[in-house]
From Swiss-Prot:
This is Pyridoxal phosphate homeostasis protein. Pyridoxal 5'-phosphate (PLP)-binding protein, which is involved in PLP homeostasis. The lineage of its organism: Bacteria, Pseudomonadati, Pseudomonadota, Gammaproteobacteria, Enterobacterales. PROSITE patterns: UPF0001. Pfam families: Ala_racemase_N. Keywords: Pyridoxal phosphate. GO terms for molecular function: pyridoxal phosphate binding. InterPro entries: Ala_racemase_N (IPR001608), PLP-binding_barrel (IPR029066), PyrdxlP_homeostasis (IPR011078). Monomer.
Length: 229
């Protein structure tokens, strides 16, 4: 049994243990394997270990992998990097999800270029929940307007929000960010029937993300590099 297989088993067990310990419903938590800078062989090992959704940060690297792994028809590809206007066509034509819509122009362009496909692209709105100058994502005060724009795009399926909160020194402040994100998610659920996805949590904050009801976590290092304990 390889390390990737072992890591995935441990991560899944940790998730289910946390949910049970906190009396949360034993719901299905989607694990997105962040596969940037990972070789095809490692991705194949993850696939053989039961992972079927992968996140890519760089367009061309992602496209190369999609082409090389075409025979795996059940694989779902997420674009999780910053979306540049001149890359929207290739993203819309090749990826199943885009998790990082943070401005109206990007939503409009993705919708335009997705038209050739027979099914809409699943999308998330990226929110800069910590209001960091260096982070991508729309600021909290403007999210409602962007949500409305996305919801009106016929070739986009508006599924929810994605966040990457800043790592805070004080846990109370960290949890405030997660709490605010969960609040926005629930507000959007009231407004739009299609909303069902809160993409929150990485290798280093899985438990915190689950505590605030994330149902999609993005894990790279703990799958492909470290031996999880």
């Amino acid at each position: 049994m390889n390390n990737i297989n072992i890591n995935i088993k441990i991560i899944k067990k940790k998730i289910q243990y946390f949910l049970k310990k906190n009396n949360y419903p034993l719901k299905k938590i989607k694990i997105i394997a962040v596969s940037k800078n990972q070789g095809i062989d490692k991705i194949k090992l993850a696939i053989s270990s039961g992972i079927h959704e992968f996140g890519e940060n760089y367009v061309q690297e992602g496209i190369d992998k999609i082409q090389k792994l075409k025979k795996y028809q059940n694989i779902i590809w997420h674009f999780i990097g910053k979306v540049q206007s001149n890359k929207t066509k290739i993203i819309a034509e090749n990826f199943d999800w885009c998790q990082t819509i943070d401005r109206e122009k990007i939503a409009i362009l993705l919708n335009k270029y997705r038209e050739k496909k027979s099914f809409p692209m699943n999308v998330l709105m990226q929110i800069n929940i910590s209001n960091e100058v260096t982070k991508n994502g729309i600021c909290i005060k403007n999210y409602k307007k962007l949500a409305k724009t996305i919801s009106l795009m016929p070739n986009l399926n508006f599924r929810g929000i994605m966040m990457m909160p800043e790592v805070e020194k004080k846990m109370i402040k960290q949890n405030d960010n997660y709490k605010n994100g969960n609040f926005i998610f629930n507000e959007l659920k009231k407004e739009y029937q299609s909303i069902d996805t809160l993409s929150l949590g990485t290798s280093f904050d899985i438990e915190n993300a689950l505590l605030f009801h994330s149902n999609m976590i993005r894990i790279g290092r703990f799958i492909f590099k470290n031996q999880v304990r």
